[in-house]
Structures are given as structure tokens and as C-alpha cells.
Design a protein with these regions (language model features):
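Sec/Tat signal peptide C-region and signal peptidase I cleavage site
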Residues: 22-26
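N-terminal secretory signal peptides that target proteins for export/translocation
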Residues: 1-5
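Interaction/scaffold regions that mediate signaling and macromolecular assembly across diverse proteins
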Residues: 27-115, 119-288
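Bacterial N-terminal signal peptides
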Residues: 9-21
Length: 288
């Protein structure tokens, strides 16, 4: 979830705050720095009548082999344990997706395609640079103030060079306008919603999106109340506009909150703070 903001160095952020005191509030500054949906209209092409399906079984096998949930409820990947054959299989899976004429598929199949491609490419990129403490340490994006891999054109789809940023902010967010997409794309960080254990498909997308929303909202890294003060994941500040159609972030959070959390939220109108943990979601970090 994750992903191409907060890339401005600390010094520049400090200068911004000094020059623009009204923006010093972290939430307000985050909103301004956050990437907005920017439609790449070339990817709106689809065939509503298509019944073709893409095989994501290779991604399912990878997830089944290397994902584990820690005692803290965070799903991590055993990056250091991924075998050479499985690395090659992951690259082959990504290549198979890149070769698909995705513009000829139906919308539901396209959504699953882009989410799985984003997540698989993110994991593959981590593996290429592992070990790292954070995905932000993979400094391959172009631009003076960029960090992380999100801005680099890592993929070629239907003759177009495509980055992870393109997939999230120019394809998924503007075309589907689905706030739960933030529970689907994974930025390989502890603070991010869990990478789900199953590949997305046209048939299971709705279930997985709801599952992801419930899991994140009801985990402390998504929503946390202490001494009557509400702390939310920075995702809800960065992408606040994506939740507007549901009545805003608070309405969205209440919708997916378990009964106990929902009751606690009744007397709270807004968050007091936002936080995010950019440490890598590496299974080795919780080994005894």
C-alpha cells in the first residue's frame, strides 16, 4: 500500500514546513504530497464480453510456500528462504502476465491481473536487492527526490513501459475508484495491509477486498485507540480522497470495524495522529 510518498528528504520537508507554516500539520502536508489518481486512458480498453481467464496458480504456489503470519498478526515473507528455482518461477509468472493482451479481457479479470502483477513484481524486486531493511532503500526510481522502486519502469505491457506507480495511481485507483484497493496492493512493509494468501481472481476479488479491509481496520497498525485518542494508518491520510464516496475515512473505518472497535469509535470524530512502519515485511525479523 503502499508507497511513493514521503520520498521528500527530511531537509526539504523541513523547508516546506518553515516556508508554509499552515502546512506544518503532518496530515495536511501528507495530503498535499500524496499522489493523486492520474488516469492513463490507454488502459481503460477492455472487452466486457470476454470470458478469458489468466492463470495465477504460480503466484498462489509462491504465496503458499513463503508467506507466514507472525504472533503480531502481520503477514511476512521469507525472502531469505526463496529458492533459485522459485525465484525463476516468479520471474516466469511475471513474464507470462506481461505477455497477456490485457486490453482484451473483461474488467474483473483486469483488476485481478493488475493487483497480482503489482504484488508479484514488488516481491521480485525485493528479492533482487535483498537483504534490505526497507523497500525504500531500493533507490532505483528516477528523480532527485525519489526513493524506492515505485517510479522505475520495471515492466513492459502491450508495448508500454509501466512502473508500480503507474499500476497503482494511473490504472487501479482512477479506473476502478475502489478504496479497498489499498488493502490489495502491497508495499512490502510492516505498516502495509497484509499480503493476502491467495492470488486475486475475477471470482474472488470482492471477498478478498472485504477480507483485507476487515483485517487491517481491526489491527492496531490500521486503527488504534489509546487513552481516547485515535491513531490511524497514514494510508488514510495519504489517500483520504479515495474514501470520500463512502462518506470519508471515519465512515469507512466504522463500516469494517468489529463490534468492540465500532463502539469505541462512536465518540471519536477524527484521528489525532497517523503512523506507518516502513520496515520490510521480512519473516526473518521475527525469528528467535
Amino acid at each position: 500500500m503502499h508507497r511513493n510518498l514521503l520520498r521528500i528528504p527530511t531537509l526539504l520537508a523541513l523547508v516546506l514546513c518553515l516556508l508554509l507554516p499552515a502546512l506544518a500539520h503532518a496530515n495536511l502536508l501528507a495530503k498535499i504530497l500524496a499522489p493523486k489518481p492520474d488516469l492513463w486512458s490507454r488502459w481503460t480498453a477492455h472487452d466486457a464480453s470476454s470470458e478469458r481467464r489468466i492463470d495465477h496458480s504460480a503466484w498462489d504456489r509462491f504465496l503458499d510456500s513463503y508467506l507466514s503470519e507472525g504472533p503480531d498478526g502481520v503477514v511476512r515473507i521469507a525472502y531469505g528462504s526463496v529458492s533459485r528455482p522459485d525465484r525463476a518461477a516468479l520471474r516466469a509468472y511475471i513474464a507470462s502476465l506481461a505477455a497477456a493482451p490485457i486490453s482484451t479481457y473483461a474488467r474483473a479479470e483486469q483488476f485481478a491481473f493488475w493487483v497480482n502483477l503489482y504484488n508479484a513484481q514488488t516481491v521480485s524486486t525485493i528479492l533482487e536487492h535483498y537483504p534490505v531493511q526497507s523497500i525504500r532503500d531500493i533507490d532505483i526510481s528516477p528523480g532527485l527526490f525519489a526513493d524506492g522502486p515505485w517510479g522505475k519502469k520495471l515492466l513492459a505491457i502491450e508495448g508500454e513501459s509501466v512502473s508500480l506507480d503507474d499500476i497503482e495511481h494511473r490504472i487501479l485507483r482512477p479506473i476502478w475508484q475502489e478504496p479497498r484497493v489499498h488493502y490489495a496492493v502491497n508495499c512490502a512493509s510492516i505498516g502495509c495491509p497484509n499480503l493476502l494468501r491467495s492470488a486475486f481472481t475475477a471470482e474472488n476479488t470482492e471477498r478478498l477486498l472485504t477480507q483485507g479491509a476487515i483485517a487491517y481496520v481491526n489491527h492496531p497498525r490500521g486503527v488504534k485507540i489509546a487513552d481516547g485518542a485515535l491513531t490511524l494508518s497514514s494510508i488514510y491520510a495519504w489517500f483520504e480522497g479515495d474514501f470520500a464516496a463512502e462518506g470519508g475515512v471515519m465512515a469507512h473505518v466504522r463500516r469494517y470495524a468489529d463490534p468492540e472497535l465500532a463502539t469505541a469509535l462512536e465518540s471519536i470524530d477524527e484521528a489525532s495522529a497517523f503512523e506507518y512502519d516502513w520496515r520490510l515485511n521480512d519473516a526473518s525479523s521475527v525469528r528467535g
